[in-house]
Structures are given as C-alpha cells and as structure tokens.
UniProtKB/Swiss-Prot annotation:
Protein family (similarity comment): Belongs to the PetL family.
Protein name: Cytochrome b6-f complex subunit 6
Record GO terms (molecular function): electron transporter, transferring electrons within cytochrome b6/f complex of photosystem II activity
Transmembrane intervals: 4-26
Amino acid sequence: MLTITSYFGFLLTALTITSALFIGLSKIRLI
C-alpha cells in the first residue's frame, strides 16, 4: 500500500513539474 501511494505521489510530482515546464516554455514562446 505504501509503495502504491509513493508511486502515485511520484507520478503526480512528475506530472506537475512537466506541466510547469511546458507552460513556462509556452509563455516564453508567446512573448
């Protein structure tokens, strides 16, 4: 159970970082 929770936590963190980087690149390109 702990491994599943940590796995989803890691996946959520990776998704958040990827989204932040993607939005950052989009803003830079728009400017």
